Every structure is written in structure tokens, then in C-alpha cells.
UniProtKB/Swiss-Prot annotation:
Function: Key component of the proton channel; it plays a direct role in the translocation of protons across the membrane.
Topology versus the membrane: Multi-pass membrane protein
Entry GO CC: plasma membrane; proton-transporting ATP synthase complex
Lineage: Bacteria, Pseudomonadati, Pseudomonadota, Alphaproteobacteria, Rickettsiales
Main location: membrane
Gene Ontology terms for molecular function: proton-transporting ATP synthase activity, rotational mechanism
Gene: atpB
Subcellular location: Cell inner membrane
Record-given protein name: ATP synthase subunit a
Length: 242
């Protein structure tokens, strides 16, 4: 019997907490976000707490992730982006660990929920907007009118650019949530047929599952990278008005 592949995304209360009429219960989603944060902090503390001239494997892996983030900022924002390394690095690591936690058997994929990814996207959107106005003042609004636009086309271009700008949180959040959900649904559906397929195809389904799991891990890493690099592109608009 095929189990509902959407059950794995159910949010369950672990500790029921209510303050007046507000439900602020501690859920499996909150637990996995907390666990991912603690694990990430522990990982990078161990990687960088005692740096060596001849680095350990843990230090090398931590440096690779750090250099990846700094390269993203340098390539998309330039030297002015260095001050945003802590924010972008935290964003990338949090999404990466949450994505990878979903690959653990009986784990929970936090980033498959649009409310989580939308909250992250809104934070990026607010940061970009605030940085833009703080750095450029009202001149930041020139972002919505590309240089060289004919005067008669200006009203239409402003509307299009404004709509595109406001749609950024939706596109960022939907891309991440949809990709994580689709991949896990596919794995769940195929895994439910593995036992049946083994009767007819012997051990062939096992390598297939290994390949699919490997591909899903790749997607988890890729989606964290895409979310972060798009955040850098948006940040470039605020810093350099490009």
C-alpha cells in the first residue's frame, strides 16, 4: 500500500505552549531549525577554534564554505560586499544545514514549508531595501527606472521594475520550497515501490535509490547556493544601484 508522500511534511506539536490566545507551541519544525543551528555552530566552532598551518579536514571544509560565500559577494557586490559576509554566510549555512537535515531518515525538511522560506526571503528583501535607502537615500528609487529609458516609456518601466522588485521574496521562497518538496516526494514515492520492484528486478532498485538520494543531496546543496547567490545579486542592486 502506498503511503501518502505528503505526510513527511506535517508539522507536529512537541510541546504545547499557549500565551493568552496565541499558540506558540514548540514543533518538529522549530526543533529541526534549532538542531540545525546548534550543529552548524558546533561544526564551525570545531573547524576554526584552533586553526593550524596544516589544516585538518574539518578546517579545510569550513574554509571551503567560507571562501564560497566570500567569492559570491566579491563577484556580485564587489569589495563593498565584505561587510555583509556574516549575514550572507549565516543565511547560506542555515539553509544548507536545514536542507541536508531533511535527507536524514525520519528527518524533517524545514525548507519545504513556504512559511519558512518566505520568512528568510522577507529578511533578505528588508535588508536589501534598508541598505539601499541608508546608502543612497531617495536616489535608491532610481533603481526602478533603468538608465536611458525614453520618457514616454518611463511610467510602464517603473511599474514593471517595481512589480519585479516586490516579487523577489515570492520567487526566492517558492523556488526553494518547491524544489525541496518535489525531490522528497519523488524519493518517498519511489522508495515505497522498492520492495515490490525487487521481486521482479532483483537488486536493481537499490542502486537507483542510491543515485536518487545522491542527486537529492546535490539539489539540497545547490538550492542553498542559488538562494544565497540571488540574495547577493539583489544586494548588489542596493549597494551599487545596478
Amino acid at each position: 500500500m502506498l503511503h501518502n508522500p505528503l505526510v513527511q511534511f506535517d508539522i507536529k506539536k512537541l510541546i504545547d505552549i499557549k500565551v493568552m490566545d496565541f499558540d506558540i507551541s514548540f514543533t518538529n519544525s522549530a526543533a529541526y531549525m534549532l538542531l540545525a543551528s546548534v550543529l552548524a555552530l558546533t561544526y564551525f566552532y570545531l573547524a576554526f577554534s584552533n586553526p593550524r598551518l596544516v589544516p585538518s579536514r574539518l578546517q579545510i571544509s569550513g574554509e571551503i564554505i567560507y571562501n564560497l560565500v566570500t567569492d559570491m559577494l566579491n563577484q556580485n557586490v564587489g569589495s563593498k560586499g565584505r561587510k555583509f559576509v556574516p549575514v550572507i554566510f549565516t543565511l547560506f549555512v542555515f539553509i544548507l544545514f536545514c536542507n541536508l537535515f531533511g535527507m536524514i531518515p525520519y528527518g524533517f525538511t524545514v525548507t519545504s514549508h513556504i512559511i519558512i522560506t518566505f520568512a528568510l526571503a522577507i529578511l533578505v528583501f528588508l535588508m536589501v531595501t534598508i541598505v539601499g535607502f541608508v546608502k543612497h537615500g531617495m536616489h535608491f528609487l532610481s533603481l526602478f527606472l533603468p538608465h536611458g529609458t525614453p520618457l514616454w516609456l518611463a511610467p510602464l518601466m517603473i511599474i514593471i521594475e517595481l512589480f519585479t522588485y516586490l516579487a523577489r521574496p515570492a520567487s526566492l521562497s517558492l523556488r526553494l520550497a518547491a524544489n525541496m518538496m518535489a525531490g522528497h516526494i519523488l524519493l518517498k514515492v519511489i522508495a515505497s515501490f522498492v520492495v515490490t520492484l525487487m521481486i521482479y528486478l532483483k537488486f536493481l532498485p537499490i542502486p537507483l535509490m542510491v543515485i536518487l538520494i545522491g542527486f537529492e543531496i546535490f539539489v539540497a546543496i545547490l538550492q542553498a547556493y542559488i538562494f544565497t547567490i540571488l540574495s547577493c545579486v539583489y544586494l548588489n542592486d542596493a549597494v551599487n544601484l545596478h
